[in-house]
A protein has these predicted regions:
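Serine/threonine-enriched low-complexity regions used as flexible
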Residues: 228-250
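Noncatalytic modules at the cell exterior or secretory-pathway interfaces
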Residues: 42-46, 86-102, 221-226
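Beta-sheet-dominated interaction scaffolds and their linkers
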Residues: 5-30, 123-151, 155, 162
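Short, solvent-exposed loop/turn segments enriched in Ser/Thr/Gly
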Residues: 25-26, 138-145, 220-224, 235-242
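Intrinsically disordered, low-complexity Pro/Gly/Ser/Thr-rich segments with frequent PxxP/GP/PP motifs
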Residues: 182-184, 203-234
């Protein structure tokens, strides 16, 4: 079966720090995705499962309210019944299940758009560069690692290429560099430390290892580092970063 867009998933690394002090990077975390949609407006969140058996899990949420303050909440699943959050979220930063679902878990805004679906066997989703802040007197550069994985059970993606979406969100402040090797567990001491063994950081399209001409076989994955550049005393912004994956398959 040919590779489809739903087979190509962006996953987190094992260490996605909540500050500038903890380890960043590491091996792939195939339970946490880094793709989801922001609420179209601030709203309470609704969660439910496609399976009535999902009644023991909790979903731990971190996000921001309309004032920009970080808020947290733990929501208990009730099978296929809608459960509504107490808090109103302007955006979600992290959503993580206490245990994987028997069914797919949907996270939506109350009266607004669907935010994400957590597939069976996975734990949640997150936004890289959690609570990143600028320095009052100097610029700052942060590095966090994510992966692109081909979840197709049998087919290969040839000419696998990462393509940032220009002129949207934080495209002017984030570049990326592909690791010199697949499935690398490389980490750095904190997210202010630059990784080694990475192609030059840039904002253009780039193929996966080796030398930008590689392939992603079934269940294969490639790590790449995001580099975010912040100016001194830069104002807070509610934004996003988009990157696409392309290739050919048969």
């Amino acid at each position: 079966m040919a590779v489809t867009s739903s087979d190509l998933v962006l996953y987190a690394s094992a260490n996605m720090p909540l500050n500038d002090n903890n380890t960043s990077g590491g091996a792939i975390n195939s339970g946490i995705r880094v793709t989801f949609t922001d609420p179209s407006s601030a709203a309470q969140l609704i969660i439910f499962s496609s399976s009535a058996s999902d009644t023991s899990q909790t979903l731990a949420l971190k996000g921001r309210n309309a004032a920009g303050s970080i808020i947290t909440e733990s929501m208990s699943l009730d099978g296929t019944t809608n459960v509504t959050s107490s808090n109103t979220f302007e955006r979600v930063l992290i959503a993580e299940l206490s245990d994987v679902g028997v069914g797919n878990i949907t996270v939506s805004g109350n009266g607004v758009n669907q935010i994400a679906e957590i597939p069976i066997g996975e734990n949640g989703f997150l936004r890289p560069f959690y609570d990143a802040t600028t320095s009052a007197s100097s610029s700052k550069t942060l590095y966090e690692k994510i992966f692109v994985k081909n979840n197709n059970t049998s087919s290969t993606l040839d000419g696998a290429t990462l393509i940032p979406v220009a002129a949207t969100g934080l495209a002017s402040q984030i570049t990326y560099g592909i690791e010199d090797g697949k499935a690398s567990p490389q980490s750095v001491s904190n997210r202010t430390t630059a990784p080694t063994g990475v192609d030059a950081f840039g904002s253009g399209a780039s193929g996966v290892y080796p030398n930008g001409t590689g392939v992603l076989t079934a269940y294969d994955y490639q790590g790449f580092w995001l580099k975010m550049s912040l100016e001194a005393n830069e104002s807070a912004i509610n934004s996003f970063y988009e990157i696409q994956v392309s290739g050919t398959t048969s």
